[in-house]
Curated annotation (Swiss-Prot):
Subcellular location: Cytoplasm
Transcription regulation among keywords: yes
Gene that produces this protein: nusA
Domain S1 motif: 140-206
SMART domains membership: KH (SM00322), S1 (SM00316)
InterPro entries per UniProt: DNA_repair_Rad51/TF_NusA_a-hlx, KH_dom, KH_dom-like_a/b, KH_dom_NusA-like, KH_sf_prok-type, NA-bd_OB-fold, NusA_bac, NusA_N_sf
Cellular component annotations (GO), alphabetically ordered: cytosol
Organism: Coxiella burnetii (strain RSA 493 / Nine Mile phase I)
Superkingdom field: Bacteria
Protein name per UniProt: Transcription termination/antitermination protein NusA
Amino acid sequence: MNKDILLIVDSMSNERGVSKEVIFEAIEAALAAVTAKRYEEDDVKIRVAIDQKTGDYESFRCWTVVEDTNESLEFPNQEMTLKQAREIDSDLEVGDVIEEPVESVKFGRIAVQQAKQVIVQKVREAERAKIIRQYEKRVGELVIGVVKRVTRESIILDMGENAEALLLREEMIPREAFRINDRLRAYLYSVCQDKKRGPQLLVSRTRPEFLVELFKIEVPEIGEEVIEIKGAARDPGSRAKIAVKTNDGRIDPIGACVGMRGSRVQAVSNELGGERIDIVLWDDNPAQLVINAMAPAEVASIVVDEDSHTMDIAVNKDQLSQAIGRSGQNVRLASELTGWTLNVMSEAEMAQKHEKEAGKIKTAFMEKLDVDEEVADALVQAGFMNLEEVAYVPKEELQGVEGFDEDISAELQRRAGDVLLTQEIAKQELDEKKPAEDLLTLPGMTTELARQLVENEVLTRDDLAEKSVLDLKEIIEIDDEAAANLIMAARAHWFAEEESEKS
């Protein structure tokens, strides 16, 4: 019985907190490495098998069976052809391993010293694997660590059991300062493997999820799933918004999160360096949710554009600065929380904007439908915004517009349908036409400009070069300076050719 091996396995397993199987594997690998050094060849493959009950061990030299070949073997000290192998055992197949018992090295002081580095490496790998297994399950949770080292770029946290977490400077709340041995909470957002440093536990104190997890601790109703956090947005260290809802009508979700005399929300705020937190009532109606999220500003009116996923919000002029917030903070957080692009303006600006847009729509109706201003205005006042709505709404809805009878409604729908059909045919024809590469690569050219040019039969750089500024402004929306620059860019190769001919 080799008691030395068993004693080393027991002590290292207890000291490192690693299973005995891992230590046995490490010692086997170490003994195999020491045994291999007895051979003159560099790539001899040795396997050592330790009896985990007695500590006795055996050593074997190994060859892998490969296909017969006329060429020399890639690893002659580790491989044997199938023909050679079957001279030893006729049942062997490609991929099998032939083992030959060899004399084992003694597990003495010299062998221990030679094997030490291998054992340490194996144990370190096992510890790293253990850390990854332990913390992979905790991604998305709060963790607590002790500040071990502070640098300009990051803070290293001691998580215990040889585990360390990395808190990068950009994941720290501004103006936050920690000292060695300070305890702090953070949100574990990733576990990754670094070849040099081992497992990297990446934590954050700035992410919205950190705020959410803190509320889960302070508000038991969230853990009990009586209250649900639907979203959060933060300007770390300054301000945050969090949206909550409940399916239990008897509970006030905002009041529960605020707590008695603000105790719950204050506890969260203190952890975040005094971050001001707005608790918003969630609503499945996006417009109502935005109204709630804009608090403390009161929304006077709101216009939703689902196509562009934007909302125009009008507030009283006196509340405009409050609605926007310092450096746009309030509207930015509301936008992040709701997922909508928000445009905040005064009621007068909203009216002016909508009047301008209504004017454009009215002009489009007059041109496309060939109607007078009165009919176009009636369509706009009734809420029709484009030709598709005119063409495809139920005829009863169109007849409900003041001054429209059945004949007028039918004629408007016919005209709108004809225009849309013509546009679709033109679009298909346009798809078949493609701008030349020399047109697309001109300085100042955009995809939208190229599309408009192609619509007007300007397909190449030379087509554009022949246009004047006035010609260009008549076919696309562009100012004088931009038009001149674009035309000069298109003509540049003409001048280059002239210079080349002169020289």
